[in-house]
Regions:
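Transmembrane beta-barrel domains of Gram-negative outer membranes and organellar outer membranes
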Residues: 20-122, 134-135, 146-147, 179, ...
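Detector for outer-membrane/organellar transmembrane beta-barrel domains
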Residues: 125-217
Length: 218
């Protein structure tokens, strides 16, 4: 199973423009679970709390600049045995996203992101995505590595430059605290695509759809 059975999210936002962008279940600017290339306005901070059928996740995300989004999260899986019981394990991780918007109106915003890059490996993944903003419609496409790769994947395009990108070292379930640069953007990749549609005459209502290859039970 690759999607939440149910998600209850509470979002507290401190920002200049509350309607600028929306957030995914991991507390990132994005779609449902996928990230987009967007970031929130400068000098903003927001908190998200997600309750799924098999984990609890709380994230604090800051946008100090219009090209940088960083988040710190805690999560508690419900199905992991720890201390002789389930639901007691508590872990943390870090996410970072670098975003760039070319001056041309014809070119999309592009972002490079590292999720859980210094954690224990439960959510370790990388992505490169672009987001086109067509007023009432935002289209996000890109590639994901690591935990993004599910049952369907493609060859790593970076393998054209070096064979070492073809395989990804299994980071396992580590202690965290140190980034493993030997795995970043390594191994097979998977396409990411999703869109967000704003309903006309209802500024606060949007529809989101995405492919979500991430395997939460891997």
């Amino acid at each position: 199973m690759k999607t939440f059975k149910y998600i209850i999210s509470f979002i507290l936002i401190i920002a200049i423009d509350l309607k600028a962008n929306s957030y995914n279940s991991f507390g990132q600017t994005g779609l449902i679970n996928l990230p987009s290339a967007e970031v929130h306005q400068e000098q903003s901070i927001y908190v998200t709390v997600t309750r799924g059928s098999f984990l609890k996740l709380g994230t604090i995300t800051v946008t100090p600049f219009n090209w940088l989004e960083a988040s710190y999260f805690y999560y508690r899986p419900d199905d992991l045995l720890w201390g002789g019981a389930k639901g007691l394990y508590l872990d943390k991780g870090f996410n970072v996203k670098l975003s760039y918007k070319p001056d041309s109106l014809l070119l999309p915003r592009i972002a490079l992101g590292l999720d859980d890059f210094a954690g224990t490996g439960q959510f370790t993944r990388e992505y490169i995505v672009t987001t086109y903003d067509f007023n009432n419609l935002k289209l996000t496409t890109g590639l994901g590595w690591g935990k993004f790769v599910g049952n369907s994947s493609i060859s790593n395009p970076f393998a054209l430059f070096s064979d070492r990108f073809k395989t990804r070292q299994d980071s396992g379930f580590g202690l965290g605290g140190e980034p493993n640069f030997k795995t970043i953007f390594h191994g097979r990749a998977t396409p990411l695509i999703g869109m967000e549609i704003k309903v006309p005459l209802a500024d606060d209502l949007t529809f989101k759809v995405e492919n979500n290859p991430f395997d939460y039970f891997d």
